[in-house]
Amino acid sequence: MRIVLQKVSSAQVSVGEKILGEIGVGFVLLVGIENTDGKEEVDYLARKISHLRVFADQNDKMNLSITDVKGSILSISQFTLYADTKKGNRPSFINAGDPEHAKTVYQAFNQALMNHNLKVATGEFGAHMEVKLENDGPVTIIFDTDHK
């Protein structure tokens, strides 16, 4: 699994004119899944993200987790995180998980985050979405279970 995490002040996702999810302070997660991903990757990333200390404490030091600040997560499926751009100018997505498998793993990941007592909003898997966010920091962290 590959995740791009951005710390935000607020964010929302919509399909067409319909807002599907929105949050205040928290994380936007762009979530990419490959065919070899499963429970081990889901559990590892849910645990890591739920305990990640990137919010400022009273001394302005990154020392608080999303749970500490009562933040929320906006989780967005993002198969393009597995783009291969080595050949030519058009990316290949052959390394991205097949849609059925990816959807199952994505749903399990969101549930694992909720099992860590996090509020999770989502977009629509496989849809063309518009994501609006206000970065805080900015803080952007990339997780890749192939490199843990």
Swiss-Prot record:
Quote the InterPro entries the UniProt record gives.
Answer: Daa-tRNA_deacyls_DTD (IPR003732), DTD-like_sf (IPR023509)
What GO annotations for molecular function exist for this entry?
A: D-tyrosyl-tRNA(Tyr) deacylase activity; Gly-tRNA(Ala) deacylase activity; Ser(Gly)-tRNA(Ala) hydrolase activity; tRNA binding
Motif Gly-cisPro motif, important for rejection of L-amino acids, chain ranges: 137-138
Predominant subcellular localization, coarse grouping: cytoplasm
Q: Which UniProt keywords apply?
A: Cytoplasm, Hydrolase, RNA-binding, tRNA-binding
What reactions does this protein catalyze? glycyl-tRNA(Ala) + H2O = tRNA(Ala) + glycine + H(+); a D-aminoacyl-tRNA + H2O = a tRNA + a D-alpha-amino acid + H(+)
The record's HAMAP family line, in alphabetical order, gives: Deacylase_Dtd
Q: Quaternary form?
A: Homodimer.
What free text does the record give on domains? Answer: A Gly-cisPro motif from one monomer fits into the active site of the other monomer to allow specific chiral rejection of L-amino acids.
Entries under NCBIfam families matching the protein? D-aminoacyl-tRNA deacylase (TIGR00256)
Family of the protein in this entry: Belongs to the DTD family.
**Protein name, entry field:** D-aminoacyl-tRNA deacylase
